[in-house]
Amino acid sequence: MSTDGNNNKKGSKEGPKSSEISKFDLAKENPKLAEWMDDCIKRMNSLYKDTNINICNVMTGHEIISIIRMVEAIFMEESNLCEAEAPIKVIGDIHAQYQDMNRLFDLIGRVPEEKLMFLGDYVDRGPQGIEVLILLFCLKIRYRDRIYLLRGNHETPSVNKIYGFYVECQYKYGIGLWWDFQSCFNRMPMSGLISKRVLCMHGGLSPELINLDTIRNIPRPCEPLDRGLLIDLLWSDPTNKGEGWFHSIRGISYMFGKGVVEQACKSLEIDLIIRAHQVVQDGYEMMTGRRLITVFSVPNYCAQFTNAAAVVCLNANLQISFQQMIPPPLPEGTKAKAAPAIAIDPNIDAARADKDAIKPFVKE
């Protein structure tokens, strides 16, 4: 059932079963599925700029479960290391800021006209995580070769049960849907490789990342443990405190310095690493020259920061540019601050060496 933004009734049409997915180019091979996805995308787009309704007004729980089943089947057909060709745009954390994600699309373009790779953290902290996921899932089903969805650390049950997504699912559709999403998250790819030369992930590097096959060979479905390659891909952070590996101030995974980035680029035969995971004031921050980029893609994060949003753009020749969305004014009285620099190449004379908080790690 198609609806516009003023219709407060839930849709009633039952979605196609996951078995209707064709193995290749499913939208062209299955006109019925393509028509339904177009309708779902239209309904999801009706929520943009209309804050009086949410996804419950335009999508039934049964439809959402059908969409989840279809997209997780597509994820399982993809490699853990999704390979895509440039030109492409790389998008960082969204954190349930559905309205801001759509404003970003207004700036950078939408699928299928643009090819996009998301680096995870679709849920938590903001109010519309289900909306973010279902729009992106519908786009993935409809245009699977134009959009790539990687897993973030918030796409794990131990995190999103605490930071908002569990309560959102409970309020909108019931706890059962939260479990369906966890099953889907366990099937999402962990990393992306653009034109064989640009490695993308949510968190960062790992002492266990020996070659790209170590990513490809991570079994799925999988739920992260407390350590290991998958945890590092989701959780690790760069630091300008030194060259090597350090224990993370997060209490999980590691921090890695300039020397680790340079060695990884050499051993993995890549030119650039793009990751997300940390809010940065300009929406992007570079380390080790342009060998590592952190990107964050929604503004005014949690209304606690005054950060801009940004997207990393790679043209066909892998030349880098950025599209930036300036943050809109926050409501009067909001106590927000600038996001701190995280690992920007420092002035060596001004760099602080926090030896107590950042402790070196030596791989055994």
From Swiss-Prot:
PROSITE patterns: SER_THR_PHOSPHATASE
UniProt KW keywords: Hydrolase, Manganese, Metal-binding, Protein phosphatase
Listed InterPro entries: Calcineurin-like_PHP_ApaH (IPR004843), Metallo-depent_PP-like (IPR029052), PP1_catalytic_subunit (IPR050341), Ser/Thr-sp_prot-phosphatase (IPR006186)
Cofactor binding comment, as recorded: Binds 2 manganese ions per subunit.
Ranges in coiled-coil conformation: none
EC nos: 3.1.3.16
Enzyme superclass (EC): hydrolase
Gene Ontology CC, one term: nucleus
Keyword GTP-binding belongs to the record: no
Disulfide bonds: none
Location of region: Disordered: 1-24
MF-aspect GO terms: metal ion binding; protein serine/threonine phosphatase activity
Residues bound to Mn(2+) 2: D121, N153, H202, H277
Catalytic activity, reaction form: O-phospho-L-seryl-[protein] + H2O = L-seryl-[protein] + phosphate; O-phospho-L-threonyl-[protein] + H2O = L-threonyl-[protein] + phosphate
Composition bias, Basic and acidic residues: 11-24
Cofactor(s) the protein needs: Mn(2+)
SUPFAM superfamilies in the record: Metallo-dependent phosphatases (SSF56300)
Residues of the active site: H154
Residues reported to bind Mn(2+) 1: D93, H95, D121
Family named by the database record: Belongs to the PPP phosphatase family. PP-1 subfamily.
PANTHER family the UniProt entry points to: SERINE/THREONINE PROTEIN PHOSPHATASE, SERINE_THREONINE-PROTEIN PHOSPHATASE-RELATED
Name of protein: Putative serine/threonine-protein phosphatase C06A1.3
Organism listed in the record: Caenorhabditis elegans
